[in-house]
C-alpha cells in the first residue's frame, strides 16, 4: 500500500524537496544583484539583517537574501558557489531537521548557510564535528566566509584552557567536537564562580556526521572523574567468585543484547560466597554491582576485540574505528573488573563528579539539526528520540555507482583469499581500490596477505590526524590500494586522480615551508606577512601544476571504472556499510562496490547463518566456491534490520533509565546556577529551616492527634542536636490550643531569631557569601555521592525482575525516594553548617571546589594522558567493609579472604 502511495505522490523526502524548491529558486534569483555589490556593501548586509530582525522580521523572512549573501561571499573568498541542492540542504538544516547528503556533495559548505542565518540573532551557533582535526580544518576553511561577512568564528580544541574556550564560545559561530561541547557543559556546572563558566545558552547546533554522534556514540556517557576512595579488593574478590561459576548453569549470556545475568542458582552461590541473606537487598547493592561487572568482564568482553593488554594496562579498542583509545577507561567499574580478570594492577575506581549522555546533552539545544550521508535507515530513532525528521537531498549529478551483490564464502580464510585475488586483478589494470575492515586485526591480516603478493598499499588504523586525511584523499589515485578500518578518514573526500590541494601542500613541505605557513598560504584571507604572500604565490603555482596532473589522471581512472570499494564484512548497521559504499561514485563519478562475507563473520554467526550454511552443505559447495545471489543479499539486510531493531531498543531502554537521572540533574544544576548568579539566598535558607522543622514535627507527632501524647521533648532534643541552641525553644501555649502548625510556628520563629543573631554577628554581606559557599559545597558533595548510588541502583535493578516487578518502574520509584532523601540531606547539612559556623569578621572567605577533576573518560583523540597515581589504603579485618554494608570487613566481604 505504502509503495503505491509513494509511486503516485513520491516519497516523503521527494515531497519535502519539491516544497522547498521555490525558496531555493528565490535564493538563486538574487545572484546578479549580489554580484554587483562591492565587498563593503556585501559585508554591510550583515548589519542590515540584524536591524531587520530587531524590527520584527523573522529568520524565515530574511532567509532567501541571507543565503544569497553567503553564496556570493563563498565565491569571493573560496571560489565555491552553493548548488541548488545545497541550498535546499541549508533550508532543511535551518528548519531543525536532518539533511541526508551523499559523500562528496559538500556538506561542509552547506552548513555555512544556516550557520550564518542563525548567527544573526547573536545567540551563538555550534557546529559539531567528530574530531579536532575536522573542527580546526572547517573553522579555518569556512571561517573565511563568516569573517568576510563580519561575523566572529571560534573553535574549541581538546588542549585549550578556560579563557580560550570562553572566547571561542562568545563568537557568533563555534566549531568543536561533541565531546568538548559536552564536557564544557559539565565543567560549567562544577565551577564555583559564575565568571568561570565558558558556555552561553545552548541555542542552535548543526551536527556533522549526525548518525555517528547521536546513534553510534549515544550509549557512551561523558564522565568527569576525580580520585575515588574505594578499595580495589572487592574487584579481585568478585573475580574469584565469578571464576567458580558455570555458563548456562549459574549465569546466562545474551550475545545479541550483549548482556549477562545470574540464574537463581548463581544468585544462591553468590549469597553463600559473600555470606549474605539476599543479594537483591538494597544494602547488598555494591556486592551485586561488582559481581555484575566481573560477569561482564568474563562473559562479554573479549581480549583483542574489545580491549588489548599492553604494558600491563587494559586499553580499549574503539568498536567503530578499530583505534586504541589511550587514556579512556570503561566506566562503572567495568575497567577494574577486566584488570582483575587479566591479572594486571587494578587501578582505583575513579569517583564520578559529573556525567551526561550525548543524547541528553544535545536534547537541551533550542534547535538541533544534522547532516550525514546515511541517516534514513535510522529515521525512526531520530524522530522518536530527538524529534528530528530526515530529508534525503538529491545529488547534484545522477549517481552511477554499481553496487554488486554480496559474495558469500563458508570460511573467513576463503573469503580473504578471494578479496586478495580481486584486489590483485583490479590493481593490475590500475583501478584504485579502497578496502574497509571491521578491526585493526583484520586490516593487518589483509595487509600481510597483500605484502606476500607484492601489492603496494596504505593501511589506516592510526589516530585521527592530517596524515590520515592525506592518505584517504589520495585513495582515488591510479593504482592506489588503501585498507581502512570502518570510519577512518571520515570527512575527507576521495577525488578520482588525487587531490591537487594535498599534492601542492606536500610539495611545499618538501621545499622546506613550515606547516603554519602552508596552511595560511593555502587560504583566501588576508596575509599576515611578506613571507606568507610569497608562499601563497608559490602554493597557487604548485596547485595549478597539481591540477593538470590530477585532471589527466582523473580521466584515466574514470575510464577504468572509478574507485572500487570492497567491504570485508557486513556491519551490524546497514548505515555503516552504506558509508563505506558512499566513498565511491561521488559527484556523478563512476564507481563500484562489493561486500565479501563468510559464515564465520559475527553478523552471520549470530543472525541467520544456519539456513545459508545448510544450503551450502546440501549443494556440496567447497570453501573456495562462493555463492552470490540477490536473495542472499536481502537475507543479510534482514539480519541487519533485526540487529538495528535490537540496538535501537537497547538505546531507547537506556534512555528511559537515563531520563530519570537527567531530570534530577536538571533540578540540581538549575539550583546551582541560582546560587552562582548571586541571588539572595537568605529566604531559601529559611525555607529549608521551615521544611526541616515541619518534617520532624510530622515524625515526632505521628501516631496521635492528641498533643499530650506527642514526643515534644524528643523533637526539641533532636533539633537542638541538629542546629538550634540548647533549651532555646519555649512552648508557652496550652496543650488544648496546640496543633502541628502552631508547634511548627513557635520553633520556626525561634530559629529565625537565632539566624538573625548569627547574621548580625558576622555581617549581612559576609553572611550572603557564606550561604553561597556552604550551599555549593553541600550540593556538590551530596550530588557526587548520589551519582554513584544511582549508578549502583541501576546496575542491581535487574535482580528485581525475579520478583515479577518491572525493573524500570521499580528504578523510577526507588530513584524518586533517593532524590527526596538527597534534597532532605542537602537541606539538613546546609542548615547545620550555617547555624554552627564560626567566622572572624575580618577573614575573607574563599570558595573551593569539593573535588578536583583529574580526568575525563574521553581524553581527546588518542591523547595518552597518564592517570594520577593514588596510594591505596589497605582494609583492616576490623574496619567497616568497603562495600558499604555497615558490617566489619571480616564478617562481610572479607569472610573469604585469608
Swiss-Prot record:
Gene source species: Caldanaerobacter subterraneus subsp. tengcongensis (strain DSM 15242 / JCM 11007 / NBRC 100824 / MB4) (Thermoanaerobacter tengcongensis)
The protein's name: Protein translocase subunit SecA
Broad class of where this protein is predominantly found: membrane
Needed co-factor(s): Zn(2+)
The protein's role, per its UniProt record: Part of the Sec protein translocase complex. Interacts with the SecYEG preprotein conducting channel. Has a central role in coupling the hydrolysis of ATP to the transfer of proteins into and across the cell membrane, serving as an ATP-driven molecular motor driving the stepwise translocation of polypeptide chains across the membrane.
DNA damage found in the keyword field: no
Top class in the EC scheme: translocase
Binding site for ATP: 86, 104-108, 493
Chain segments carrying region Disordered: 850-885
InterPro entries in the record: Helicase_ATP-bd, Helicase_C-like, P-loop_NTPase, SEC_C_motif, SecA, SecA_CS, SecA_DEAD, SecA_motor_DEAD
Amino acid at each position: 500500500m505504502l509503495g503505491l502511495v509513494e509511486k503516485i505522490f513520491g516519497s516523503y523526502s521527494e515531497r519535502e524537496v519539491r516544497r522547498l524548491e521555490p525558496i531555493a529558486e528565490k535564493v538563486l534569483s538574487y545572484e546578479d544583484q549580489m554580484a554587483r555589490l562591492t565587498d563593503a556593501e556585501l559585508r554591510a548586509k550583515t548589519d542590515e539583517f540584524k536591524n531587520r530582525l530587531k524590527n520584527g522580521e523573522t529568520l524565515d523572512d530574511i532567509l532567501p537574501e541571507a543565503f544569497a549573501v553567503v553564496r556570493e561571499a563563498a565565491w569571493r573568498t573560496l571560489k565555491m558557489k552553493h548548488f541548488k541542492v545545497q541550498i535546499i540542504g541549508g533550508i532543511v538544516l535551518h528548519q531543525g531537521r536532518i539533511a541526508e547528503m551523499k559523500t562528496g556533495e559538500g556538506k561542509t559548505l552547506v552548513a555555512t548557510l544556516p550557520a550564518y542565518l542563525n548567527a544573526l540573532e547573536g545567540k551563538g551557533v555550534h557546529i559539531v564535528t567528530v574530531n579536532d582535526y575536522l573542527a580546526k580544518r572547517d573553522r579555518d576553511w569556512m571561517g573565511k566566509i563568516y569573517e568576510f561577512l563580519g561575523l566572529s568564528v571560534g573553535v574549541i580544541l581538546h588542549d585549550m584552557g578556560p579563557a580560550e574556550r570562553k572566547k571561542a564560545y562568545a563568537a557568533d559561530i563555534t566549531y568543536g567536537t561533541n565531546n568538548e561541547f559536552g564536557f564544557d557543559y559539565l565543567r560549567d556546572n562544577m565551577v564555583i564562580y559564575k565568571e568561570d563558566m565558558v558556555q552561553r545558552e545552548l541555542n542552535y547546533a548543526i551536527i556533522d556526521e549526525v548518525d555517528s554522534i547521536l546513534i553510534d556514540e549515544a550509549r557512551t556517557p561523558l564522565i568527569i572523574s576525580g580520585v575515588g576512595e574505594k578499595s580495589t579488593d572487592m574487584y579481585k574478590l568478585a573475580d574469584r567468585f565469578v571464576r567458580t561459576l558455570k555458563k548456562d548453569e549459574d549465569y546466562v549470556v545474551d550475545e545479541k543484547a550483549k548482556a549477562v545475568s545470574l540464574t537463581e542458582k548463581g544468585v544462591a552461590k553468590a549469597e553463600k560466597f559473600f555470606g549474605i541473606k539476599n543479594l537483591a537487598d538494597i544494602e547488598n547493592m555494591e556486592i551485586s554491582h561488582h559481581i555484575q561487572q566481573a560477569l561482564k568482564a568474563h562473559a562479554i568482553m573479549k581480549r583483542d576485540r574489545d580491549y588489548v593488554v599492553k604494558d600491563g594496562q587494559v586499553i580499549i579498542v574503539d568498536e567503530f574505528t578499530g583505534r586504541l583509545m589511550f587514556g579512556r577507561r570503561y566506566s562503572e567499574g567495568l575497567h577494574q573488573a577486566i584488570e582483575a580478570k587479566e591479572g594486571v594492577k587494578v587501578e582505583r575506581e575513579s569517583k564520578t563528579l559529573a556525567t551526561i549522555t550525548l543524547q541528553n546533552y544535545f536534547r537541551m539545544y533550542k534547535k538541533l539539526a544534522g547532516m550525514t550521508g546515511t541517516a534514513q535507515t535510522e529515521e525512526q530513532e531520530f524522530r522518536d528520540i530527538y524529534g528530528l525528521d530526515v530529508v534525503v537531498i538529491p545529488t547534484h549529478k545522477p549517481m552511477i555507482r554499481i553496487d554488486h551483490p554480496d559474495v558469500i564464502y563458508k570460511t573467513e580464510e576463503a573469503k580473504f583469499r578471494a578479496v586478495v585475488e580481486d584486489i590483485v586483478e583490479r590493481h593490475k589494470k590500475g583501478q584504485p581500490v579502497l578496502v574497509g575492515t571491521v578491526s585493526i586485526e583484520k586490516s593487518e591480516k589483509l595487509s600481510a596477505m597483500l605484502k606476500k603478493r607484492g601489492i603496494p598499499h596504505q593501511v589506516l588504523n592510526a589516530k585521527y590526524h592530517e596524515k590520515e586525511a592525506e592518505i584517504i584523499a589520495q585513495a582515488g589515485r591510479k593504482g592506489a590500494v588503501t585498507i581502512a578500518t570502518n570510519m577512518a578518514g571520515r570527512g575527507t573526500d576521495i577525488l578520482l586522480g588525487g587531490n591537487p590541494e594535498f599534492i601542492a601542500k606536500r610539495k611545499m613541505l618538501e621545499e622546506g615551508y613550515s606547516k603554519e605557513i602552508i596552511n595560511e598560504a593555502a587560504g583566501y584571507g588576508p596575509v599576515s606577512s611578506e613571507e606568507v604572500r610569497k608562499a601563497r604565490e608559490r602554493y597557487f603555482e604548485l596547485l595549478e601544476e597539481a591540477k593538470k596532473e590530477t585532471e589527466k589522471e582523473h580521466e584515466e581512472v574514470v575510464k577504468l571504472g572509478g574507485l572500487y570499494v570492497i567491504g570485508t564484512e557486513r556491519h551490524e548497521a546497514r548505515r555503516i556499510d552504506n558509508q563505506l559504499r558512499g566513498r565511491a561514485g561521488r559527484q556523478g563519478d563512476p564507481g563500484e562496490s562489493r561486500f565479501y562475507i563468510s559464515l564465520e563473520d559475527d553478523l552471520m554467526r549470530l543472525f541467520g547463518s544456519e539456513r545459508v550454511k545448510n544450503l551450502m552443505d546440501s549443494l556440496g559447495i567447497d570453501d573456495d566456491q562462493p555463492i552470490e545471489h540477490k536473495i542472499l543479499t536481502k537475507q543479510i539486510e534482514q539480519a541487519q534490520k533485526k540487529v538495528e531493531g535490537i540496538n535501537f531498543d537497547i538505546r531507547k531502554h537506556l534512555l528511559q533509565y537515563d531520563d530519570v537521572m537527567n531530570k534530577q540533574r536538571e533540578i540540581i544544576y538549575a539550583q546551582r546556577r541560582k546560587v552562582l548568579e548571586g541571588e539572595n539566598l537568605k529566604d531559601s535558607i529559611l525555607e529549608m529551616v521551615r521544611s526541616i522543622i515541619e518534617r520532624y514535627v510530622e515524625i515526632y507527632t505521628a501516631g496521635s492527634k492528641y498533643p499530650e501524647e506527642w514526643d515534644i521533648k524528643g523533637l526539641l532534643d533532636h533539633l537542638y542536636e541538629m542546629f538550634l541552641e540548647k533549651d532555646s525553644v519555649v512552648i508557652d501555649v496550652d496543650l488544648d490550643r496546640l496543633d502541628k502548625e502552631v508547634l511548627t510556628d513557635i520553633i520556626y520563629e525561634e530559629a529565625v531569631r537565632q539566624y538573625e543573631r548569627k547574621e548580625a554577628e558576622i555581617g549581612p554581606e559576609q553572611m550572603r557569601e557564606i550561604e553561597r559557599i556552604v550551599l555549593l559545597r553541600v550540593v556538590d558533595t551530596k550530588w557526587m555521592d548520589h551519582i554513584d548510588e544511582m549508578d549502583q541502583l541501576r546496575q542491581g535493578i535487574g535482580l528485581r525482575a525475579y520478583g515479577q516487578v518491572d525493573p524500570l518502574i521499580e528504578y523510577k520509584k526507588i530513584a524518586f525516594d533517593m532524590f527526596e532523601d538527597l534534597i532532605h540531606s542537602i537541606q539538613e547539612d546546609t542548615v547545620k553548617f550555617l547555624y554552627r559556623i564560626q567566622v572572624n569578621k575580618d577573614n575573607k572567605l574563599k570558595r573551593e571546589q569539593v573535588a578536583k577533576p583529574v580526568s575525563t573518560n574521553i581524553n581527546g583523540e588518542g591523547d595518552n594522558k597518564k592517570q594520577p597515581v593514588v596510594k591505596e589504603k589497605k582494609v583492616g579485618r576490623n574496619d567497616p567493609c568497603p562495600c558499604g554494608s555497615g558490617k566489619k570487613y571480616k564478617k562481610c566481604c572479607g569472610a573469604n579472604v585469608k
